[in-house]
Curated annotation (Swiss-Prot):
Its main location: cytoplasm. This is Tethering factor for nuclear proteasome sts1. Binds the proteasome. Involved in ubiquitin-mediated protein degradation. Regulatory factor in the ubiquitin/proteasome pathway that controls the turnover of proteasome substrates. Targets proteasomes to the nucleus and facilitates the degradation of nuclear proteins. Residues 39-50 have a biased composition (Basic and acidic residues). The lineage of its organism: Eukaryota, Fungi, Dikarya, Ascomycota, Pezizomycotina. It comes from Aspergillus clavatus (strain ATCC 1007 / CBS 513.65 / DSM 816 / NCTC 3887 / NRRL 1 / QM 1276 / 107). InterPro entries: Cut8/Sts1_fam (IPR013868), Cut8/Sts1_sf (IPR038422). It holds the Pfam family Cut8.
Length: 313
């Protein structure tokens, strides 16, 4: 009777519990596919585990943070008024303003004037003549429009700029004369340009107004004589011979109305022995022979036409 009574079925979770909690595992377990459905949580955990796992020989990954943009802030001084520095101030001054400032400083400090004189470069012939031409331009621009430019009225109108030109001429001329100027070519070049400026001085109807012009010719003539004498002492006057100064001085004498005749005579006396027999009274035939020999020596043709004796003397 008892064998026919059916035993109640055991719930499945009892089997699961007994399988996982068995103290004696089987020596040869048989892997069978589990019929239990996998949950989504299990899949996520397995995926995270596989992704987080890394080989033992791979370098560790260290996260890097992106550089944050740096902000540069330039410090600005407080805005307030201040005077210009000396270099910037000098940049704003023109030539006339600089001359005025330098002149006033030299007048107040004589020691500074000596330093400026020794520090400044030596004026050249070009720069000196340019200054004289600037005064000449100012003189020409001072003439009144219309009327007689040779009248006393015109003379009174241009008297001040005329005096400025003559004063500048008197100051610059001694600078280019010996012994202050040792190069005869420099002195002659200046005198040539200065004489041209004197030729351009206006002529007046009144003789008394022409006294200043005549005095300028007398001073420049004395300067010509001094330079010619010094140039004749150096190198046999070669600067006078090959510079064409005899022709230039003759032209200046003609334009001045004969007021440079003393300089022309001095040049003739200094170069008389260098000219040939066809010179304008500068030399004798003997001096012409000396000049011919000198020309042959300078050209390298001396003695080429002389016959050479062969055999016993």
């Amino acid at each position: 009777m008892n064998s026919l009574v059916a035993t109640p079925p055991v719930p499945p979770h009892f089997y699961e519990h007994s399988r996982f909690s068995s103290p004696h595992p089987m020596s040869n377990p048989i892997h069978t596919p589990s019929s239990r459905k996998r949950k989504a949580d299990d899949d996520g955990n397995d995926h995270d585990g596989r992704m987080s796992a890394s080989p033992t020989n791979s370098p560790a990954f260290t996260p890097r943070s992106l550089p944050t943009p740096r902000s540069f802030k330039r410090s600005r001084p407080n805005v307030f008024g201040r005077p210009l520095s000396l270099p910037r101030l000098l940049e704003t001054l023109d030539t006339d303003a600089l001359r005025g400032i330098l002149r006033s400083m030299c007048e107040r400090h004589p020691a500074l004037a000596d330093e400026v004189i020794h520090t400044s470069p030596r004026p050249s012939v070009t720069s000196a003549l340019q200054v004289l031409r600037n005064y000449q331009t100012a003189l020409q621009n001072s003439f009144p429009l219309g009327g007689n430019p040779e009248s006393d009225y015109a003379y009174n109108r241009v008297r001040q700029p005329l005096g400025n030109l003559l004063d500048a001429l008197s100051d610059f001329t001694p600078h280019f004369l010996p012994p202050n100027e040792s190069q005869a070519s420099v002195s002659l070049s200046y005198l040539d340009g200065a004489t041209e400026i004197i030729h351009a001085l206006p002529r007046w109807n009144s003789p008394q107004n022409n006294i200043e012009r005549d005095s300028a010719y007398d001073e420049i003539c004395k300067a010509w004589v001094l330079v010619i004498r010094e140039a004749a002492k150096r190198g046999g006057g070669i600067q006078l011979q090959y510079g064409g100064w005899d022709q230039k001085l003759s032209k200046h004498n003609h334009n001045s109305g004969g007021r440079l005749q003393a300089a022309v005579n001095e040049l003739g006396n200094s170069l008389g022995w260098m000219h040939g027999p066809d010179s304008q009274g500068y030399s004798s035939p003997a001096a012409g022979d000396l000049g011919s020999i000198r020309d042959q020596l300078l050209s390298g043709t001396y003695g080429l036409g002389t016959p050479v004796k062969v055999g016993p003397w």
